[in-house]
Amino acid sequence: AQRKTMFQPFEKETGIKIVEASPTDYGKLKAMVQSGNVEWDLVDVGDLNVVAGAKDNLLEPLDYQAIDTKGVFPQVIHKYGIGTIYYSTVLAYSTKKYAKGDHPKTWAQFWDVGKFPGPRTMRNNPLDNLEFALLADDVPMDKVYPMDVERAFRSIDRIKPHVNVWWTTGAQPAQLLADGEVELATSWNGRIFAIQKQGARAGLEWNQGKLQWDSWVIPRGSKNKDGATKFIAWSTQPKPQAAIVNEIPYGPVNQRAFEFIGAQAARDMPTAPDNAKRQVMVDPAWWGEHRNVLVERWNAWLLK
């Protein structure tokens, strides 16, 4: 979707060619910058990696003289990064198993394997899972942060034996649902809409989802900082933002994009008012401080 709605139109308009290198990997970014051999000029990272990258001195500060932030939501603007799109991690389910309305609607129900039996998949990462574990343990949405990590791990201990696959790429949970290998999943909302378009019998539940965003960052030592800055300035404007959202229902980071977004796409976005109010907004600062320790703990926990 990015290639069609952003990269190609930007190339056509400016003559600046964008060469994609995938996937984004924080470890690789760190190694590049620290070795002085920076191959990437611009990187699409999760919101937490902006905080981590700034802390690790891996990023160039953005030039906000050249980037017009009019209409951009304040929480996605950072000295070292700016939002690309909003997305949600949600509870997804097989509509073959669950007719509309009788699927789990909370993480407590996802955890309830007696009432909702069946194979499950969750992300192989503490991100998202710890929030969902607290919600499953009846922590109110507005009290999730700062997280009670011990309580979260006690809660996730209970679901661990019932998770058939710990997914590592965004495409995986949607594919597992489409193939009928699992009946319940945590997934990024756009991936579920994509398989629905292809006819897969899958649905998603916005309630207790986790709302977050991706960001553009420029690695320290980028060889084409000017080109990267031009792309960021272009891509955060209303029309490019609307173009990507009309293609796949993520949320624009620029409020002015709503003028150019179709009614159906607007309803399906994670930031649609009815959807956003039922979700937890990520706290990147909290994760930026605790992430490394929790990833180590998670990896050890998974092996137990």
Task: Indicate residue ranges for each PLM-predicted region.
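Conserved C-terminal helix/tail region of periplasmic/extracytoplasmic solute-binding proteins
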Residues: N275-K304
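Mature extracytoplasmic/periplasmic domains
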Residues: P219-V282
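Periplasmic-binding protein-like
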Residues: Y87, E150-I159, Q196-S222, R256-F258, ...
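Early extracytoplasmic/lumenal segment of secretory-pathway proteins
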Residues: A1-G53
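Extracytoplasmic ligand-binding site segments that recognize negatively charged/polar headgroups
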Residues: A1-K4, V38-A178
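Paired acidic/hydrophobic, glycine-rich loop segments that form the ligand-binding mouth/hinge
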Residues: W40-D44, W166, E183-W188, G203
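A ligand-binding cleft/hinge motif common to bilobed small-molecule-binding domains
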Residues: N49-A52, A178, E183-R201
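A bilobed periplasmic-binding-protein/Venus flytrap-type ligand-binding module shared by bacterial periplasmic
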Residues: A92-K97, L134-D138, W213-G227, A243, ...
